Amino acid sequence: KLKWAKYKLKALLDSARSRTVAEEPVRGLLYTRGTKPQVLIVMDSFSPTNRNAILEPLKHLDAVDVALWVPEDASDYLDGQYASERYSRKDWSEQEISGDELNNLLPDVRIVLSAAQFLGRGAVTYEFSRAIGAEYWMVQHGLLVPQAPPLPVGCTLLAFSEADAEFWASGRRDVTTHAVGSQLLYLAAQKAAGAEAQK
């Protein structure tokens, strides 16, 4: 619980900083695998829900050049649980960038995958996706509450369930939705099944 609270506090502070220092560009580490990334995965925090919702797709993107833009070092996540067994940390290049460099560094991106368009990197990459004509995919990473921010215009939502998709889209016609399940709940069920089998 303490780790979760620290992640939430850091995300809130990052969000507040990005609003109060508007002239300062959002910075982060950009990892790339391949020469022409077509998918940009964006994270504003490494919370457990974000790691499972946003990094887990790396396992299924073996044939695609990928970029990952994060607030801090992500080496631990690129060489094990979340990255494909085919790839290791050495397959990724790394550089510190600001959001205004995305257009020059990632001209071939077709999909931006994020969990929050209202935080620093999420907001910058939403604008980046609009500028280059890329799709912006939002991934549900936690339970929805009535205070959840609205989805960005024209996005594709990957939701836990049809009910979650319907609730969050709120009847909007500009949002495309897909019910894909929850990686966190899937892993919890697998862990519970494994523990039950060991009894």
Enumerate the predicted regions with their spans.
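Acidic anion/phosphate-binding donor-loop and adjacent secondary structure
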Residues: 148-149, 184-198
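N-terminal leader/presequence regions that precede the main folded/catalytic core
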Residues: 2-7
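Active-site and donor-binding regions of nucleotide-sugar-utilizing enzymes
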Residues: 1, 12-185
